[in-house]
Regions:
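A secondary-structure boundary/capping signal
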Residues: 31, 60-61, 86, 107
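Flexible glycine-/small-residue-rich
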Residues: 32, 52-54, 61, 120-124
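Residue-level signature for short turns and capping positions that connect secondary-structure elements
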Residues: 35, 50, 64-65, 90, ...
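A positional/architectural concept
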Residues: 3-56
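Beta-rich strand-turn-strand
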Residues: 85-121, 125-127
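Arg/Lys-rich, often Gly-containing low-complexity segments of ribosomal proteins
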Residues: 9-14, 42-43, 69-88, 122-152
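Short, surface-exposed acidic-centric catalytic microdomains
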Residues: 55-72
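N-terminal targeting/trafficking signals and adjacent low-complexity tails
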Residues: 155-156
Length: 156
């Protein structure tokens, strides 16, 4: 059976601010109105981060807009949500977080075979000069692609 993946929210800022060392997939504990809201695309992970507390993983600052027809069943849009991973994986991540400068960030939220999943990244913060360097590389790559397009256009 083929898995259907629909990306709901991406955290592009995480790739700019951090070096992503490893990626993991985790489930997330949600209420029904939150799932409906996510299916409609009302989710933001721009400022979200992950905390490990007593062997459990929690995502903080993940904004899910209230479902418009949810009335009293709607929850706080910024509430703390539990991530679902195996204990062994959580212990492994917890030990890696003890290293200096490592953190866990949310990279994306997506639907996989009808279930809401979160892509978690083990990340190391970039310095300002690293950010400038990555911007320069991106600009250089864009200029090269434009030059190739321009030359191919005039060949015809």
């Amino acid at each position: 059976m083929k898995e259907h993946i629909k990306i709901i929210a991406n955290n592009k800022k995480a790739y700019f601010d951090y070096f992503i060392l490893e990626k993991f997939e985790a489930g997330i504990e949600l209420f029904g109105t939150e799932v409906k809201s996510i299916r409609m695309g009302y989710c933001s992970v721009k400022e979200s981060f992950i905390k490990i507390d007593k062997g459990q993983m929690y995502v903080l600052n993940m904004h899910i807009n209230p479902y418009e027809r949810g009335n009293i069943f709607n929850k706080d849009p910024l509430r703390v949500r539990k991530l679902l991973m195996h204990k062994l994986e959580i212990r492994k991540l917890s030990s890696k977080l003890q290293e200096k400068g490592l953190t866990l960030v949310v990279l994306s939220v997506y639907l996989k075979s009808g279930l809401v999943k979160v892509e978690v990244g083990l990340a190391k913060g970039k310095k300002n000069y690293d950010k400038r360097e990555s911007l320069a590389k991106k600009d250089q790559k864009r200029e090269i692609e434009n030059e190739i397009k321009r030359r191919n256009f005039y060949k015809l």
